[in-house]
Amino acid sequence: EKLNDWWTGGRTFCDQDDPRAVGGYYTQDDIREVVAYAAERHITVIPEIEMPGHSEEVLATYPELSCSGKPYVDADYCIGNEKTFEFLENVLLEVMDLFPSEYIHIGGDEASKNGWRNCPRCKKRMADEHLASVEELQSYMIHRIERFLNDHGRKLIGWDEIIEGGLTPTATVMSWRGEEGAIHAVKAGNAAIMTPGKYCYLDAYQDAPNTQPLAIGGYLTLEKAYSFEPVPDSLSTEEAALIKGVQGNVWTEYMPTPEHTEYMIYPLSLIHI
């Protein structure tokens, strides 16, 4: 019954006959309930729709949006394919209808870019747009998606890789690989959020690993997390004002229960409030 609700819930992209559609989803009503529950508690839910990388699941179902045209080969959308933008814009329209947040997160991190280098369509896009590198090709996509979001009254957030190839005019940068991405962003006049992994990733081991549940790796003690200063001394007063805050990240693939998740995020998450 729940799966039928998902199929018939007004989603733009849903392969109803795909036997791999086995669950792990929210219906539109589920999302509206979460957004409303959060809003009652003065919390804004900001959705993240990953692009161009981290898209293996989408490309397994829609392989025509990849450079190879085959499932389970690429993790990045084909930026040379105009259907990629048609797909993503339709997804974002649906997302914006469900989430009233001022910001929409588009990911932008960890794209391998390997498929683009030998893709005829990506090569043509680079030639037509006078792009000198695959980094600039990714930036072309981010610029284009930013304009689409801005035209619909929203603002773009992306991980610090969106700086590579040229930062877009209004993007907010989430600096996860260190502090340098945020510094670069604010010096360019863009807003930034500090979330460097060595201080802000709450899925790391927080004590001796042999005394803790299995984690993805890393090591973040309470003392180290508290030592983080999110506004570098090198910034001017005006630049410092563009640091909008700190974000603590928790990825739950090693956390099978809500209780385990709470164990990992408290008290570390209180540092980031």
Q: Where would I find each of the regions flagged by the language model?
A:
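Polar, glycine-rich mid-to-C-terminal structural blocks
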Residues: 186-193, 197-205, 209-210
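Hydrophobic faces of well-ordered beta-strands that scaffold small-molecule active sites
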Residues: 45-49, 104-106, 156-158, 173-175, ...
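Long, C-terminal catalytic modules of enzymes
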Residues: 241-258
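Active-site beta-loop-alpha junctions enriched in small/polar residues
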Residues: 50-54, 109-111, 161-163, 176-178, ...
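Active-site neighborhood of glycoside hydrolase catalytic domains
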Residues: 68, 73-169, 176-179, 183
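Anion (oxyanion) recognition and catalysis
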Residues: 32, 39, 150, 186-187
